[in-house]
């Protein structure tokens, strides 16, 4: 009986951490790898790869926990989220706090194996991860904060590899903010009607009828900035081929969003995983 209860509790924790939905971790992992490879101009050390890969999954899990904790009084009113562990009572508020602290603690132990500059940067990263879920109460620009939080691994990666934060680092950071606004607006379009009812803010609500147009403009700006990244990092032709393929995927996403229906918008969101992967392959092959 106790074993069954423990298994049930672990299942609830895993759902709270979104272990069954790795898309969020992957969208965080690809920009981290872009940064590590560009900073090293080669394959990064095994130690740094292990620290940042594990850190991505731990901090994404921590982000999901604090996000659900912040939304615990709202999720019960949204069809897609009403069965999440906190609103359903499968996980208590105290358990969520302990789980969040444990995940952050493990992440910080990993960071302690890196240089002091990276350790200090991680403190700012934690602050961004903490405030992100609460921004939706006061601003429609939640996705911008998400981009900064998700992208903070970029300056941390450059710091860990080279102990410097060159221009290409910040251009890449800006690229990630734009990308986060793109894919999280697509994600928010799925919940727009529910969010309007309960008073939660998002860029999908802010952009309104111009959502597809603004996403398209952001996609174009992102591609232009990635061309600049290629120039600053002296990346090869294979990178620009990958960039062209990513642009085609953005066109495909626009087609998916044409009627603003929930399922196709969610599919457009998921498609961004391939954008990140293809860009990483282009960067990886450029340094072989």
UniProtKB/Swiss-Prot annotation:
Could you mention a single GO BP entry for this protein? ubiquinone biosynthetic process
Q: Tell me what topology the record assigns in the membrane.
A: Multi-pass membrane protein
Q: Which domain of life is it from?
A: Bacteria
Q: What is this protein called?
A: 4-hydroxybenzoate octaprenyltransferase
Question: Which cellular compartments is it found in?
Answer: Cell inner membrane
**Its pathway?**
Cofactor biosynthesis; ubiquinone biosynthesis
According to its UniProt record, which reaction does this protein catalyse? all-trans-octaprenyl diphosphate + 4-hydroxybenzoate = 4-hydroxy-3-(all-trans-octaprenyl)benzoate + diphosphate
Q: Which family does it belong to?
A: Belongs to the UbiA prenyltransferase family.
**Name of one Pfam family that matches:** UbiA
Per the entry, what this protein does is:
Catalyzes the prenylation of para-hydroxybenzoate (PHB) with an all-trans polyprenyl group. Mediates the second step in the final reaction sequence of ubiquinone-8 (UQ-8) biosynthesis, which is the condensation of the polyisoprenoid side chain with PHB, generating the first membrane-bound Q intermediate 3-octaprenyl-4-hydroxybenzoate.
| Alphabetical UniProt keywords | Cell inner membrane, Cell membrane, Magnesium, Membrane, Transferase, Transmembrane, Transmembrane helix, Ubiquinone biosynthesis
Enzyme Commission no: 2.5.1.39
Q: Does the keyword Coiled coil apply?
A: no
The transmembrane segments are 38-58, 98-120, 141-161, 163-183, 213-233, 238-258, 268-288
């Amino acid at each position: 009986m106790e074993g069954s209860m423990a298994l049930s509790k672990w299942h609830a924790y895993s759902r709270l951490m979104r272990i069954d939905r790795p898309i969020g971790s992957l969208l965080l992992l690809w920009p981290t790898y872009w940064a590590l490879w560009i900073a090293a101009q080669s394959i990064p050390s095994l130690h740094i790869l292990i620290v940042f890969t594990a850190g991505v999954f731990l901090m994404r899990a921590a982000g999901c926990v604090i996000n659900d904790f912040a939304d615990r009084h709202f999720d019960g009113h949204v069809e897609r989220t009403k069965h999440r562990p906190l609103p359903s009572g499968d996980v208590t508020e105290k358990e969520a706090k302990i789980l969040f602290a444990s995940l952050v603690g493990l992440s910080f132990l990993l960071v302690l194996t890196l240089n002091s500059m990276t350790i200090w940067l991680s403190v700012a990263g934690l602050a961004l991860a903490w405030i992100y879920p609460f921004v939706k109460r006061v601003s429609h620009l939640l996705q911008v904060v998400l981009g900064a939080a998700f992208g903070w691994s970029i300056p941390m990666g450059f710091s860990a590899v080279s102990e410097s934060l060159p221009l290409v680092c910040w251009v890449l950071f800006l690229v990630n903010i734009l990308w986060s606004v793109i894919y999280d607006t697509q994600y928010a379009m799925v919940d727009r009607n529910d969010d309007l009812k309960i008073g939660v803010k998002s860029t999908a609500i802010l952009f309104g009828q111009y959502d597809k147009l603004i996403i398209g403009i952001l996609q174009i700006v992102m591609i232009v900035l990635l061309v600049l990244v290629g120039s600053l990092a002296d990346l090869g032709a294979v990178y620009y081929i990958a960039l062209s393929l990513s642009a085609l995927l953005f066109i495909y996403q626009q087609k998916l969003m044409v009627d603003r229906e929930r399922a196709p918008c969610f599919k457009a969101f998921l498609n961004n995983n391939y954008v990140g992967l293809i860009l990483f392959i282009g960067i990886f092959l450029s340094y072989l």
